[in-house]
């Protein structure tokens, strides 16, 4: 398990994402050799384990044992998933790009597992129910309230109808 601050979407069709990892990290070698990884969405409930996995090396310990996170099997790749996570994104590395302090691993998304708890009857994922966290400059934050949906800044307001 590695906690990665630098990650994001690269492309939606085909689905791709990236993670950036320092070459001196223990996980860097495993990423390079296996070419596979899982991005596990982390939440407020998992914040302490997330931090632990970011500051302790897996070189001499099993982070699953140390954090009591539940280890599961991925569906399409040979890397473990964190079952406690509401979303597991299985990835296969397409390209490695050395970028100074970090190597960017650009990967194809090969499978996504989502906990049904966070899905509605229409198949929509409700991120706010999962209570994800973000990390910025050494601090973890919860996301809080939704500020708007895509395009809300330009959407025309509906006019009120007058009753006749």
Predicted segments with their positions:
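Basic, polyanion-binding surface patches
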Residues: 1-164
């Amino acid at each position: 398990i590695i906690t990665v601050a630098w990650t994001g979407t690269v492309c939606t069709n085909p689905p791709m994402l990236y993670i950036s990892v320092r070459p001196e990290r223990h996980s860097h070698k495993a990423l390079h050799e296996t070419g596979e990884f899982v991005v596990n969405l982390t939440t407020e409930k998992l914040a302490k384990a997330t931090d632990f996995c970011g500051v302790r090396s897996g070189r001499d310990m099993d982070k699953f044992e140390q954090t009591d996170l539940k280890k599961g099997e991925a569906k399409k790749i040979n890397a473990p998933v964190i079952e406690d996570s509401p979303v597991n994104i299985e990835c296969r590395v397409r390209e490695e790009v050395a970028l100074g302090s970090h190597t960017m691993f650009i990967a194809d998304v090969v499978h996504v597992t989502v906990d049904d708890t966070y899905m509605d009857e229409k198949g929509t994922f409700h991120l706010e129910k999962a209570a994800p966290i973000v990390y910025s400059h050494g601090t973890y934050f919860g996301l809080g309230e939704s500020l708007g949906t895509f395009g809300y800044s330009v959407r025309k307001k509906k006019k009120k109808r007058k009753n006749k």
